Amino acid sequence: MIKLNLSNLQHFAHKKGGGSTSNGRDSQAKRLGAKAADGQTVSGGSILYRQRGTHIYPGVNVGRGGDDTLFAKVEGVVRFERKGRDKKQVSVYPIAK
């Protein structure tokens, strides 16, 4: 007579393991872009355009911050202009009083 040892039964998984993924997260939006429109009146120190790199160049009465943000140096009217054939710039022209 053959004796079976039933205490040595092994149960294998009937479903695959869940695994993991390296995705599933996203960075916060940086709120880049134009902060003042063409023709809008701004005061000195106002932020005109937030950017990474020089997508738009500073023109008349416009400064560039350390993070490439463009800001008005004087109070005036904002104008987005072409600079040459393929570049853009933003200028602020003082209001004549």
UniProtKB/Swiss-Prot annotation:
Report what the Swiss-Prot or TrEMBL entry states about this protein's PTMs. Answer: The N-terminus is cleaved by ribosomal processing cysteine protease Prp.
UniProt keyword list:
Ribonucleoprotein, Ribosomal protein
| Any one of the GO CC terms | cytosolic large ribosomal subunit
Task: List the GO molecular function terms.
Answer: structural constituent of ribosome
Q: Name one Pfam family in it.
A: Ribosomal_L27
According to the UniProt record, where is the region Disordered? 13-38
Q: Which residues form the propeptide?
A: 1-12
Tell me the SUPFAM superfamilies matching this sequence. Ribosomal L27 protein-like (SSF110324)
GO terms, biological process: translation
Entry-linked HAMAP family: Ribosomal_bL27 (MF_00539)
Instruction: Identify the NCBIfam families for this entry.
Output: L27
Please report the name of this protein according to its UniProt entry: Large ribosomal subunit protein bL27
**UniProt gene name:** rpmA
